[in-house]
């Protein structure tokens, strides 16, 4: 918008100045990566989704967030891409649940006509007032145990580095899995436009 740019250039911005302590609401947490080689099967995809989901869920736990919507991004070798999303059973920040849901969404939506070049994963629709409903199937208790395990793994990674502990899935191809979106995560400034 040319008029807006001209106003900014002249210093005519009339929006109120925000206080330095005011933070923006977080709307999503995600990571994406271009892989070092093309992905050719579901096992390759699971390795990448495992690394991405562990990073995303770790960042959500650090912020005390649980998300209810999962999105995946897939780009193939010829740079055709798509995004798909699904609602999760309940708000979660458990990496295993995110991996399982991402793989289920991927398997339903990709037919392997072409190798994959890039994958992404994000969680949105955060439940800030999370409370769980009473459940006879004990899924809430299972989720709490998994959250405690993930939190213990986070503490180990914080203390000894990202590669001190991990899921066995990522050991099938260390060339694919040897990246750390959690450590390499960059937050880019938001444009006023």
PLM feature spans:
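DNA-contacting surface of Y-family translesion DNA polymerases
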Residues: 1-115, 188
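Acidic, metal-coordinating catalytic segment for phosphate/diphosphate chemistry
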Residues: 90-193
């Amino acid at each position: 918008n040319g008029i807006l740019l001209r106003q900014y250039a002249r210093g005519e911005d009339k929006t109120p100045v925000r206080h330095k302590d005011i933070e923006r609401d977080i709307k999503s947490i995600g990571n994406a990566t271009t892989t070092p080689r093309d992905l050719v099967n579901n096992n390759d995809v699971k390795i990448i989704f495992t690394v991405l989901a562990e990073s995303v869920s770790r960042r959500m736990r650090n912020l005390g967030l649980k998300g209810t919507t999962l999105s995946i991004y897939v780009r193939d070798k010829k740079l055709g891409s798509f995004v798909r999303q699904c609602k999760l059973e309940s708000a979660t920040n458990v990496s295993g649940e995110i991996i399982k849901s991402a793989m289920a969404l991927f398997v339903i939506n990709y037919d392997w006509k072409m190798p994959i070049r890039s994958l992404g994963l994000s969680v949105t629709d955060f439940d800030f007032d999370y409370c769980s409903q009473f459940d006879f199937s004990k899924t809430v208790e299972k989720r709490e145990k998994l959250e405690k395990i993930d939190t213990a793994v986070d503490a180990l990674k914080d203390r000894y580095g990202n590669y001190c502990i991990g899921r066995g899935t990522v050991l099938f191809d260390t060339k694919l899995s040897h990246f750390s979106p959690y450590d390499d995560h960059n937050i880019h400034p938001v444009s006023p436009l």
